[in-house]
Amino acid sequence: MAKDILFKNEDFVFSYRVGGILIHEGKILLQKPKNDDYAIIGGHIALFETTGETLIREFQEELHADIEVQKLIAVGEIFFPWGKRPCHQLAMYYLVKLKDPSQIPTDGVFHGYDDLDNERIDLDFCWLSLEELKNIKVYPEELIPHILSGSEEIFHFVSRQI
């Protein structure tokens, strides 16, 4: 298995991540780790893997769902705390589409998991109406107004949480 582009030392973390924005019948699918905020589904890009290949792999691993990667709509430079260390993350966000909607529930909440640093992370996958995005915290927050606008222009944002 290829190594994720995720570098850590005692002083900082660098992360290269990709997220898939899956909207189906007026609802968006988000992931929610236990005791954390909602987030766009995705993961770390592996060495020599394209962002599209990563999204296809991540949706397969976490949801057992086949997707079609449609269009890059945002690029984020994100600075946030990773435990006690600062993290500098570069992230790309794409619109994605289910190839076969019968592969996963298309309403409500269902469960899955991810592995990060050899640790299993339990996740809830939640379908929320686009209207609900205005009233909840979703990471990264800067991306939500762009999603709600319906624009397919590439949006660049910087998020400084540290």
Model-derived features: positions:
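A short gly/proline-enriched turn/hairpin at secondary-structure junctions
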Residues: 39-42
